[in-house]
Amino acid sequence: MIFVTVGTHHQPFARLLDALGDSGLENLVVQHGPGRPPANVARCADYLPFEEMLACFREADAVITHAGVGSILCATREGHTPLVVPRRHDLGEHVDDHQVELTRALEGRGSVVGVWDTARIPELLEAAPPRRPAVEPVEPELCAAVRSSLAQSSDA
């Protein structure tokens, strides 16, 4: 299963969702936000509860994500080297280019595979590094507190 998340940002991410629809990829589970999901999905939802998102990261064979810090951290914690498609300001996908900057920085460290041409997603998936064992957070209490805070803010 390939898990795809566009995060919780209010602007749609049609560029990524359309590319997935054109990709020929199968067995996609897509969290699509306010955008319209591609037709070739096994399962989709506009938003998922945090625990369900974590389960998707755990169960996925591969992860494709926007360049949200939380999504990238969840993917890497589960041993994935995620394909990261940064939202771009010039395309009206975000308010600035911090996702482009983050993707470049993490790609330079080998932590993610930056997707600069969405038509290349299938070949980048094929070439992506194999999944590593999942890692436990260094400070589980801190992570639990952050999770709790995020869950409370999403319930509001």
Language model region names:
Residues 1, 27-32, 62, 99, ...:
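Conserved catalytic or regulatory cores that recognize and/or transform ribose-phosphate-containing ligands
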Residues 1-59:
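Donor-nucleotide binding loops and adjacent catalytic segments primarily
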Residues 11, 48-54, 58, 66, ...:
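Residues at secondary-structure transition points
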Residues 16, 71, 102:
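Conserved sugar-transfer catalytic core signal across GT-A, GT-B, and GT-C glycosyltransferases
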Residues 44-47, 111-120:
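Short acidic-hydrophobic, aromatic-tinged amphipathic segments that line or gate anion-handling sites
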Residues 53-92:
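A donor-sugar binding/catalytic signature common to diverse glycosyltransferases
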Residues 81-116:
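Catalytic binding pocket for nucleotide-activated donors in carbohydrate/polymer assembly enzymes
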Residues 123-156:
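C-terminal amphipathic helix plus adjacent low-complexity
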